[in-house]
């Protein structure tokens, strides 16, 4: 008889009674707790729900509360969840968060608190967030506040923090059988089908990272999940997110930024540079440490940015130095893009990719999903077409198949050059495995050809190892729910069939319900693809946020669990929510608190 599939999402599959720890005023050191709001301290506040009463901890947007420890005396594996008081006002946005780790561990994970349900303006509830299954032998649990210094001194306004509200810990011990099942699941490689993307900008923008531990937080959520690759952005155009000898740094000499977060981003990079710490290397090392591959990703069209967020264009740049290599549109006007029609542009980009490959990365990824096209009506490609076909492409329909096919030869040549360069770097380093090449592309055959990409040739010649269609929506629309019909992937499945090329469709939009993520994954699997990609996993506004969606998302490589869930009637996957009855001395059972 075939064994029944167990759906191991969160802690719902465990059999033991949970242990609730609601007396958070036991945390140490005691002088980091206060009964009234105080800088650098956690405020204690009593509360009641139907099944529990206790003392929660709160910290505000300027508190910069100290790290505290809840002491434990437990052994073995436990599922750890945390009860939180969620977002209650639009001003808090997605910034409400807590930091959590075991005592003795080096790196926190950031849990982004969810919004409260729509229960009216005076409705208050606690929400449970599943963290992970971990061995608590010899460990307590540590809570921190996510924040950044934004001004000198040690006063109100010196720090900007994510408000935090922690009510309880829930621990469920694993039985011997459950421990064996969990460990067997962790050792399995056939479910590790998921690939994550981090733009290496959002975390600096949001939190002004300044230490290696801050960078490692962006990697830590993928530990013990179905993810096998991290696609970490290394640059775009001539700007790099690593210490480069070829490109520029993210340390623009600018006094007025279009967004406050961009100033935080630059200040973060300046501090890392002054300390000689390369965030790229930290991310690479920690990714490998937790067992994932690391693929350096590059925005091929990132040479020049549109206003009003054009502060990225400040100072000397490849774009400004070489107007002769810019794009040209159908009317003969210069466009604000570097054209890959010119070999000099391609070789500059390849020099950056070579530099990235001199680090112990597993692959590079070319991001063709922003600010296309890279080839238009530049003189070399126009004259070449005239010689071959005897026609001027300016007089043809813009989508004439001969013109589109011929023009796509430019990026095919670029991909050949990239393949040759990566193979050469691999041989020079004595690598046993090829430096892999991934490409994020458009969602249809026509869209890709219009943007100069002949994917059939790329796959047929072995120029790309992983193909990532960005979305099934037109014009790279990130807001469209992608891949609602298996037929939308048919073209890509046929392209890679019988080849070594991996197909990993990107699931969009970024945020969906846990049920919707399972539906989209089921569609991808039914279409014949075995892997999935997730653009923008970074930070609290990304996907690795520990909300309900992350519980489902991090196990989407378990196709059997998705199938079993659908066969059982698709039960709700959301976490428990419990109405607060009392908060401090306020009775919340009144229509308005009183």
What do the PLM-derived regions correspond to, one by one?
Residues 132-154:
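Noncatalytic modules at the cell exterior or secretory-pathway interfaces
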Residues 344, 348-500, 512, 516:
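Active-site neighborhood of glycoside hydrolase catalytic domains
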Residues 238-279, 307-340, 372-409, 559, ...:
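Aromatic- and acidic-residue-enriched carbohydrate-binding clefts of CAZyme catalytic domains
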Residues 1-71, 593:
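Glycan-recognition and processing domains
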Residues 213-244, 359-363, 463-469, 524-532:
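Catalytic domains of carbohydrate-active enzymes, especially glycoside hydrolases
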Residues 103-138:
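Extracellular carbohydrate recognition and processing domains
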Residues 72-96, 594:
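A short beta-strand element within beta-rich, extracytoplasmic domains
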Residues 186-212, 254-285, 289, 294-358, ...:
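Active-site-adjacent "subsite" loops/lids of carbohydrate-active enzymes
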């Amino acid at each position: 008889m075939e064994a029944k599939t167990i759906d191991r999402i969160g802690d719902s599959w465990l059999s033991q009674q949970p242990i609730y720890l609601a007396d958070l005023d036991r945390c140490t050191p005691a002088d980091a707790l206060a009964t009234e709001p105080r800088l650098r301290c956690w405020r204690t506040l009593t509360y009641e729900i139907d099944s529990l009463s206790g003392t929660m901890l709160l910290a505000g947007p300027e508190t910069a509360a100290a790290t505290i420890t809840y002491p434990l005396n437990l052994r073995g594996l436990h599922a750890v969840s945390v009860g939180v008081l969620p977002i209650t006002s639009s001003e808090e946005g997605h910034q409400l968060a807590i930091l959590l780790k075991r005592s003795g561990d080096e790196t926190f994970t950031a849990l982004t608190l969810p919004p409260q349900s729509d229960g009216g303006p005076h409705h208050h509830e606690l929400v449970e967030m599943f963290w992970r299954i971990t061995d608590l032998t010899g460990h307590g649990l540590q809570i921190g506040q996510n924040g950044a210094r934004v001004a000198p001194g040690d006063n109100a306004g010196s720090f900007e923090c994510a408000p935090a509200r922690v009510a309880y810990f829930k621990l469920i011990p694993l039985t011997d059988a459950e421990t064996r099942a969990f460990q067997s699941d962790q050792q399995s490689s056939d479910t590790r089908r998921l690939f994550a993307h981090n733009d290496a900008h959002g975390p600096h923008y949001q939190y002004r990272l300044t230490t290696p531990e801050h960078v490692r937080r962006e990697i830590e959520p993928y530990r013990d999940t179905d993810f096998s690759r991290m696609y970490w952005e290394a640059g775009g155009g001539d700007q790099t997110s690593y210490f480069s000898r070829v490109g520029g740094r993210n340390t623009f000499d600018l006094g007025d930024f279009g967004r406050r977060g961009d100033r935080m981003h630059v200040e973060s990079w300046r501090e890392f540079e002054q300390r000689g710490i390369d965030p790229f290397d930290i991310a690479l090392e920690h990714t490998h440490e937790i067992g994932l591959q690391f693929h350096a990703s590059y925005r091929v069209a990132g040479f020049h940015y549109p206003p009003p967020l054009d502060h990225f264009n400040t100072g000397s740049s490849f774009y400004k130095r070489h107007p002769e290599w810019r794009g040209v549109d159908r009317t003969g006007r210069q466009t604000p893009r570097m054209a890959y029609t010119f070999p000099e542009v391609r070789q500059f980009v390849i020099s950056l990719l070579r530099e990235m490959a001199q680090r112990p990365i597993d692959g590079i990824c070319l991001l063709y999903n922003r600010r296309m096209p890279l080839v238009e009506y530049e003189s070399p490609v126009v004259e070449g077409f005239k010689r071959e076909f005897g026609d001027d492409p300016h007089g043809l329909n813009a989508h004439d198949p001969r013109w589109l096919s011929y023009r796509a030869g430019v990026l095919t040549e670029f991909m050949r050059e990239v393949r040759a360069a990566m193979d050469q770097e691999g041989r020079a380093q004595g690598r046993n495995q090829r430096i892999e090449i991934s490409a994020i592309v458009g969602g249809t055959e026509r869209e890709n050809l219009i943007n100069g990409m002949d994917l059939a040739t790329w796959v047929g010649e072995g120029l790309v190892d992983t193909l990532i269609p960005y979305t099934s929506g037109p014009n790279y629309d990130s807001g469209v729910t992608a891949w609602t019909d298996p037929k939308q992937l048919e073209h890509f499945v046929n392209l890679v069939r019988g080849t070594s090329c991996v197909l990993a469709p990107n699931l969009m939009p970024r945020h969906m319900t846990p049920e919707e993520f399972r539906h989209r994954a089921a569609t991808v699997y039914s279409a014949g693809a075995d892997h999935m990609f997730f653009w923008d996993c970074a930070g609290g506004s990304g996907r690795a946020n520990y909300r309900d969606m992350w519980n489902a998302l991090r196990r989407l490589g378990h196709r059997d669990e998705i199938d079993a869930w659908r066969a059982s009637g698709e039960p709700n996957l959301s976490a428990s929510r419990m109405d607060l009855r009392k908060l401090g001395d306020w009775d919340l059972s009144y229509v308005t608190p009183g």
